[in-house]
């Protein structure tokens, strides 16, 4: 295996924060610190930082940038560095033991990142997700959808609780329907005790917010469908049980060529690969509770939908039930199959 010190001329470690980043440039061959500098996170600040690092590294194309928090604080810098033609990786985790007796500061952290990256094998480098084009657009829509769905649920729960405590003429013993919520949103103020007036006004406000979220979620779903239809993954929408949201999660989880090297690796990423837990004469496996839980949840939703509405899947479920398997075990098998199917 080739390590970074042999395959790259220089390594630049970056300790990232909201207002400023600290950059440390080291010689990959011997680990010598060539310079350490702080720059603001503005576009001009990042351009100056890249130019400064380029001068210290003689503009070598084989310079490797190791950036901390590459999906959050370091995202803009990672894009700028990639656009400048350099290779970018996620900074490795620095162990607490390695910091002992050294202390902690931004320059120390930046140098530690560069030094730790220098000793890694090339296949241990964590390359960032692709963050442009359709995949990044879907990632934004997925995050927005999850936030809106959560807020809609919170408002619905608040409205249900309000109607169960205050007699406003709506039967809230069961979950509220959109028809009932629409009716509430059209209520007018009326002559009644002050407590009921306030409760009714609050119910109207919550109902209107719920309907607004519903409309925005519908628009969000349409945007997802349009983007997925334009991507190479468009056939996903034709798969039984796969909707716009679950298809978007499958696409964004994949992120870039090379992240998943095999079908088994994709199953591990999705958290659907059984983990051996055997000892002596006992042979068994336990659930994989790691991996990308959002991707795992998407496969769960698809499996549940197929178990209810897909004829071939229902036939499979009946067969496995006659063999003595439980519904839970069958669902796990289905999720493992789906991981294999979508990888291929």
Question: For the regions a protein language model found, what residue spans apply to each?
Answer:
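Gly/Thr-rich phosphate-binding beta-strand-loop-beta motif of the actin/hexokinase/Hsp70
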Residues: 2-28, 113, 148
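Nucleic-acid-processing active sites and adjacent nucleic-acid-binding tracks
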Residues: 29-60, 64
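Short beta-strand-loop/turn "lid" adjacent to the catalytic site in phosphate-handling enzymes
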Residues: 62-79
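Short, charge-rich amphipathic alpha-helices with coiled-coil/heptad character
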Residues: 119-139, 189-194
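Glycine-rich, often acidic, oxyanion-interacting loops/wings at catalytic, nucleic-acid
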Residues: 141-234
């Amino acid at each position: 295996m080739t390590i970074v010190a042999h395959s790259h001329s220089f390594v630049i470690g970056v300790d990232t924060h909201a207002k400023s980043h600290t950059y440390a440039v080291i010689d990959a061959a011997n680990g010598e610190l060539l310079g350490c500098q702080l720059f603001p996170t503005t576009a001009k600040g990042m351009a100056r930082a890249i130019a400064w690092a380029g001068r210290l590294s003689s503009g070598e194309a084989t310079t490797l940038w190791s950036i901390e928090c590459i999906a959050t604080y370091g995202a803009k810098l990672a894009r700028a560095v990639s656009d400048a033609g350099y290779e970018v990786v996620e900074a490795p985790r620095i162990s607490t033991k390695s910091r002992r007796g050294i202390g902690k500061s931004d320059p120390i952290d930046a140098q530690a990142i560069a030094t730790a990256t220098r000793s890694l094998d090339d296949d241990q480098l964590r390359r960032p997700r692709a963050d442009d084009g359709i995949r990044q657009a879907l990632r934004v829509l997925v995050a927005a959808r999850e936030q809106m769905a959560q807020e809609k649920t919170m408002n619905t729960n608040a409205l249900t609780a309000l109607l169960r405590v205050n007699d406003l003429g709506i039967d809230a013993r069961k979950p509220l329907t959109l028809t009932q919520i629409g009716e509430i949103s059209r209520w007018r103020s009326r002559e009644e005790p002050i407590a009921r007036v306030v409760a009714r006004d609050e119910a109207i406000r919550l109902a209107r917010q719920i309907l607004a979220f519903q409309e925005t979620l519908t628009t969000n779903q349409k945007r997802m469908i349009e983007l997925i239809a334009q991507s190479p993954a468009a056939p996903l929408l034709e798969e039984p049980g796969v909707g716009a949201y679950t298809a978007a999660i499958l696409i964004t989880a994949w992120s870039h060529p090379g992240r998943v090297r095999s079908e088994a690796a994709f199953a591990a990423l999705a958290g659907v690969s059984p983990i051996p837990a055997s000892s002596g004469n006992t042979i068994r496996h336990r659930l994989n509770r790691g991996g990308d839980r959002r991707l795992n949840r998407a496969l769960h939703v698809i499996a549940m939908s197929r178990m209810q509405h897909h004829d071939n899947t229902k036939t499979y479920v009946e067969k496995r039930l006659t063999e003595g398997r439980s519904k839970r075990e069958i669902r796990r098998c289905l999720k493992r199959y789906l991981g294999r199917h979508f990888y291929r």
